[in-house]
Regions:
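Membrane-proximal intrinsically disordered regions of secretory-pathway and membrane-system proteins
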Residues: 1-203
Length: 203
């Protein structure tokens, strides 16, 4: 059932979320359960590929990284905030959806984005050379950023039924707001993590 739900969600994230909020929940996996499944799979894969493990010379640097990694576990959910904010700002009054239903949409979309990250990591299970990993770390954030924005816009179009060409600007605006909100949330979270780690280490 989980595999079927993931496949249906990937094919039509907005339609999947719309069916859920309109009451067809027996055939849909709960958004939180699906999100936790995706995050768990991504964490396991990142550990296998050693994607987030840098080469650190000193013991102090290793301790600092361990603390940063511990706090960064919550960062996998930051995209939900950006998706939710952009949807509320642009489409909040459309079709009568309430805040909770739009939050469910945001969780489902974020689950698809994480599924895309999982696919993006799979080649590193085969090509493990350090130069390949370095190249992947350099370019992946850009390609994934574009792909995730397209997923968000595609899902918004389905969920909010944006079918008229004269309304396309709303999708473009929502995509731009998503990019800005995601960048802002990540910057704030990163700064908060650094400050907490510095405080714990007495720096």
């Amino acid at each position: 059932d989980a595999i079927k739900s993931v496949w249906k969600l990937i094919r039509s994230p907005g339609g999947f979320a719309r069916d859920y909020v309109l009451g067809k929940r027996s055939a849909q996996m709960h958004p939180l359960g699906l999100l936790l499944l995706m995050i768990g799979a991504l964490v396991v894969l990142l550990g296998e590929t050693q994607y987030l493990v840098p080469t650190l010379a000193s013991e102090e640097a290793q301790r600092m990284f361990a603390l940063v990694r511990e706090y960064s576990k919550w960062s996998f959910s930051l995209g939900i905030i950006a998706i939710y904010a952009s949807a509320m700002l642009v489409f909040r009054k459309r079709l009568g959806y309430n805040a909770t239903e739009i939050l469910a949409l945001a969780v489902y979309i974020h689950a698809v984005c994480i599924a895309l990250q999982i696919v993006n990591q799979l080649p590193l299970l085969v090509w493990r050379a350090p130069e390949v990993l370095q190249w992947h770390r350099k370019w992946s954030p850009w390609t994934m950023g574009v792909a995730q924005t397209l997923i968000v816009v595609f899902a918004f179009r389905q969920f909010f039924r944006v079918t008229r060409w004269r309304e396309v600007w709303k999708l473009v605006l929502a995509g731009g707001l998503f990019i800005a909100a995601k960048w802002g949330v990540q910057q704030l979270y990163a700064r908060a993590v650094v400050e907490i780690v510095h405080w714990q280490m007495g720096l």
